[in-house]
Structure formats: C-alpha cells, structure tokens
C-alpha cells in the first residue's frame, strides 16, 4: 500500500492527500484511524496514560480507546472511546441500557386473584443485570380490577375499615337496583430485598341486573436505584388482595375473584440514567 505524506511549511500533515486542509488530514475510503488502545482502571484515574513531555497526567483533549470493563460501582469504565477532560475520562459514546419485564398471562381475564398473596407470572424469581454502574430508573406499572359485586336489597351507604391495609371500603346500596363496591389490594415489588408497595383500588357495580366488573385502574411507581454493572439483582412481584364481604364470595372464589392485567399487562422497566 502506498501512503503519501505531505508536509507544508506551516506544519500541516496530510496522509494520502497532497493538500491537507487541517493540521492533520487523513484520507481513506476504506480504512479508519485506530486510537491508542489502553486498559483504564477508573474514570478518575489517568494511568496508564501519561503526558509524554512531562510524565504527568495527560492534557485535556487526549483520546484513547479503552479495552477493559470495571465493576467497582464507582467511576467504572467500559470498552469504548474516551477523552481526558478536567481530571477524568469522559466516554465519547452514549450509554444506553433498558429492559422491560412484562406479566406473561394477559388477555381477556389476565390473572384471576383470590384473597391473600397472588404471585404474578413474569415476575417470579426474575433477575436484572445492569450493563453499567450508576443510577437506574425503575418504573413499575400495575393494574387491578374487582370481581362481581353482591346484590343488596336495602338502601344504605357504609364504610368498612380493612384491617389489612387501614383503607376504607365504601359501599353504596340503592334499593335492590344499584350496588357500588370498592375492592382493593396492594402490589409488592421486591427488588434486592427491598419492598416497594403500590396500593390498588377498583369499583364494581350491580345495576338492575347489569353488572360492571374488572374495571381496572392503572397506577405507577417510580424508584431510582444505584446499581453495579455485571451484578445480577433478584426481584419478584406479588399482589395481596384484601377480603371484602360486599364482593361475591368475599372476593375469594368464582366470579368474586379480581383481575390483574386485563388486556394490558403489568410491567416493570429499567432504564440507565447516569453514572
């Protein structure tokens, strides 16, 4: 391969060009420039790169291609191009890491729930392994709908405190024609041993022989997590449905059971935010 160098009086260098248009002008239709390949140990450590004139830290604007991955949890580096600027190596590529986990049983009924703990398929003994060390945004999206409300022949409005949650159920009965019942429960997302709880509430109605149920309500919960690259974090999600005597079979069987993920599944999304 013939390489042509051009040196002008004002110190311009051209490679494969006789008319360089900058201090250094490299011309090739098939090849690129290979930056020095080094094994960095941390973003805030200059070594093994040094300034060849002083033997000290490199000057701002020094480029290298890092070949290593660290996973200390602080100032980690990953393979790619870096520039030294203000006493640290700054990555010259976008750090992007995202993963979505979804409820696996979905559709017209989703998961039918009973009183007490209900494991949610798709969130049973799962793991997430981050690509980078730093802050991740975890968004948990859940939805829940109640089962059949009971028929009631009397007119009244009552409030009942659920001992499991401290929340009040509101029940409205209007003759034998109309019954509105609030059904509730709580999602628990356990990530790496820490619980994140999301309260859920839904209304079921009975009106002159017409039933409205599985009227699901969607809610979200956002948490920011400091994670270490390459470490596998365990997580699970369950739903605890509270007993309600105004739902058929107390909500524990048959048409009184609740609904999770009707047509739209519950999901959890991890997104890398920053170092």
Language-model region placement:
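N-terminal start-of-chain detector that recognizes signal peptides
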Residues: 4-5, 52-54, 206-208
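C-terminal trimerization/auto-chaperone modules of long, extracellular attachment fibers and adhesins
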Residues: 1, 12-126, 259-263
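Extracellular jelly-roll beta-sandwich "head" domains, especially the C-terminal globular C1q domain
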Residues: 94-275
């Amino acid at each position: 391969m013939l390489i042509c160098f051009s040196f002008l009086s004002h110190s311009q260098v051209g490679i494969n060009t006789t008319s360089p248009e900058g201090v250094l002008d490299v011309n090739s239709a098939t090849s690129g420039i290979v930056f020095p390949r080094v094994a960095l140990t941390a973003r805030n450590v200059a070594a093994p790169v040094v300034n060849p004139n002083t033997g000290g830290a490199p000057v701002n604007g020094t480029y290298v291609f890092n070949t290593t991955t660290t996973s200390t949890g602080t100032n980690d580096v990953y393979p790619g191009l870096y520039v030294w600027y203000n006493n640290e190596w700054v990555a010259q590529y976008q750090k992007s890491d995202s993963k979505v986990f979804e409820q696996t049983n979905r559709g017209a009924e989703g998961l039918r729930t009973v009183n007490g703990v209900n494991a949610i398929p798709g969130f049973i003994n799962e793991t997430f392994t981050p690509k980078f060390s730093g802050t991740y945004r975890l968004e948990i999206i859940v939805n829940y709908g109640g089962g059949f409300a009971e028929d009631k022949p009397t007119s009244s409005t009552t409030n009942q405190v659920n001992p499991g949650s401290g929340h009040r159920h509101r029940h409205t009965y209007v003759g034998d024609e109309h019954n509105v019942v609030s059904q509730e429960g709580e999602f628990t997302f356990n990530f790496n041993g820490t619980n994140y709880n999301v309260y859920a509430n839904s209304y079921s109605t009975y009106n002159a022989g017409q039933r409205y149920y599985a009227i699901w309500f969607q809610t979200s919960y956002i948490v920011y997590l400091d994670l270490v690259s390459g470490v596998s974090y365990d997580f699970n999600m369950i739903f605890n449905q509270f007993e309600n005597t105004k739902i058929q079979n107390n909500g524990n069987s048959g048409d009184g059971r609740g609904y999770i993920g009707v047509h739209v599944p519950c999901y959890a999304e991890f997104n890398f935010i920053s170092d």
